[in-house]
Swiss-Prot record:
Annotated gene: dabA
Keywords of the record: Cell membrane, Membrane, Metal-binding, Transport, Zinc
GO cellular component terms listed in the entry, alphabetical order: plasma membrane
Assembly with partners or alone: Forms a complex with DabB.
Organism: Chloroflexus aggregans (strain MD-66 / DSM 9485)
Protein known as: Probable inorganic carbon transporter subunit DabA
Amino acid sequence: MTMVETNIKTMSVFANPTPTLSREDIADAVRRAEQRIAPLWPLRNFVAVNPYLGLIDHSFAQAAHVLACRAGARMTLPRSFYAQAIACGRITDDDLAAALAEGIPFRNAPETVAALKAFARDNAPEPVGNVLPTVADLAAKVTGSNWSTIVTDSISNWAGAYFDQGQSYWRSPWAKLPAYEAWRAEAAFDRTPLVRGARAFHRVLRAMPGTAAETIAVAIEQLQVPATGLEAYLHRLLLSIHGWASYARYLRWEAELYGGHDKTLTDLLAIRLVWEVALWQSFARDGVAAAWERSIDEMRHGQDDDEYKRVLGGDLLLQRAFEYAYRRQLFAQLGVAAPGTPVTRKRVQAAFCIDVRSEIFRRALETVSGEIETIGFAGFFGFPIEYIPLAEVEGGAQCPVLLTPQFVITESVDGATPSEVEAAITKRAMRQRVAKAWRMFKFAPVSCFGFVGPVGLAYVRKLLLDTLGITRPVPHPATFGLDGQTRARVKPSLEPRPFNGRLIGMSLPQRIAAAAGALKAMSLTDNFARIVLLAGHGSTTVNNPHATGLDCGACGGHTGEANVRVAVQILNDPAVRAGLREHGIVIPSDTVFVAGLHDTTTDDVTIFDKGDIPASHADDLQRLERDLVAAGRLARAERAALLNVDRNTDIDRAVRRRSTDWSQVRPEWGLAGCAAFIAAPRERTAGISLDGRAFLHNYNWRQDGDFSVLELIMTAPMIVASWINLQYFGSTVDNRVFGSGNKTLHNVVGTLGVLEGNGGDLRVGLPWQSVHDGKRYVHEPIRLHVLIEAPIEAMTAIITKHEQVQQLLDNDWLYLFAIGENGKVTHRYTGGLRWETCA
């Protein structure tokens, strides 16, 4: 017997702990529990993630029960919300009947419309699920000290320093070690557990093995967790440090995307289990041992939660009825779009991201001029690139997080000689270093105290200008370090060349293939206008840690500027156009592609690289810019009501002011309200107000002979839209578990995430202010309704081919409908590769 095994034996509260599971069984349970955690992207590219991603192999109802038992989480709104919707007529008896007709989620849930209405009116306290207890939970009960919070705070404090990405000036001395090793090294010096009363903590710490996998196995053996409850227990532990576990899951996601693996999540689980064993050992004689044995017995034999399931079933039926109410109104709008005035050739075709915020602007632009056709496509416009700014050596992925960048593009200075480019790079790098040194002086532990006195008065002017919204508190990273003249000349460089050990740029065959793929995916292969605008999108906000969450998710949490500028360069290239003819795509010689960026906060559109637009199109461009200004005015007027902007004020000024107001917690509503995804020709939705709630993707199945574009839509944009929809869903129904709380209390930690206040777990999801205006829900949780105009046989074949798509659909995480020739919904997918006709 080794010394470690001897130490472990002597610390057990069981007389003779024996292995109940093989190491392989334990490793398999660890893997399954870790897969239940959804990734959390850092603030620098905060993209929307489905918080239920690890549970999509469960039905929506089953997942609701699992999360109630493992995290005390809700997946529906308070019952009073549905009762009010019934009372005011939003939910009708027909909606309730339709919800009941689909089946009862759990036994003894209401089975009639009358019973369901009575259930909604019931004001009795809502029961919660029997949450699987951890040893920390039991220790809290027997000692009176909140050990669950103490453990989370302790791990979070360590993790904030360990994962820090440049915010702190004193780095952890163990930052280069694997997470578990780094934590053990630091915990050996930490007396907080001893002060708090966990007298066995350091003894347990010393006795544990040196690797995370071995520690987990030893801890499970010591705790005698049965096989029937092991995955649930491990998942419960990870949910107790949900934010940091989610960030570790992101590290693994990124590693796996590029063919690697990351063990940080396993390390965190080992850390959490050390705490469990230590608390068990510390408080065994105070009642924890007996309480834990009862918990183990419940893991073996299950819990009696029939009453909770009855209530949960009723709540899920009300949620389903609420979704039927939305569906009824949406379907009534379709198939009645007014035909536009026939035009042989549009003056402008304007392609926007499918983002729901574009729906309002697209409708406004088409209202301004009937000679403009708008197009919806994922905002990276089919160009999955890594974009490296001038003077940087690495860039960000400008594509959906489901994809990996296929090309690396750098910035250069247009028209500059190599020496001028080098000088611009040197100057920007120097300014960035000086700014970093100055910031270190301001915030360093020693110099910060002497900074305010002699230098503080010099900041009075800037403070006033920032407060008035005239200047930005922090320079925009895209332009920081560049003078005005250089900034105007910076543009993407596509030429293939070696850079920092990599081959960057795009060859001509690569440009032709990418251009053909993008145009086909947009269903834009003929009848080109004189001007084709590709408009990416971004947002303008200040003092907002989650700012990148308002940028383009299809661009990996960045603006779409880089993608549209690259796309336009390629599509205007005569050599590329010549190559496109071999793909059956003939772009007229008088068609010019133009790059733009839609600011979703202000509804202003910026046109890039105007100097590249030929003089022959100068009048066309001026007219387009006037149309964009007019459309922006209409869009701001429509959004003003949701933003609580007084219509008697200068709406344009008031909306723009929000983008520079550093006290504004709701500069815009982002994608709040998202509820539908429609892939069809634009004429199906033209002239219809969808209230900024629908993702609109152009698709013409008649031009998609092999249905490869349909497959792309159902496996990429549809999935991304469901992630966004379910992130907003989770942040609304239970912001405590799936959201990030009160934005006014946020503190950035390590530049990668936020805490609510000065402690607690890293927060996931959206702030409460992103879904609620203080009086009502601006985002109403409705699972995504996907409407596609395509043969149901083609959609069924794609569902069969892709497991994740089938899981999302068969388990009710989103709804799929087919649109017919007349624009009306004809069929609904009901699961198991079956469809039913819609009345």
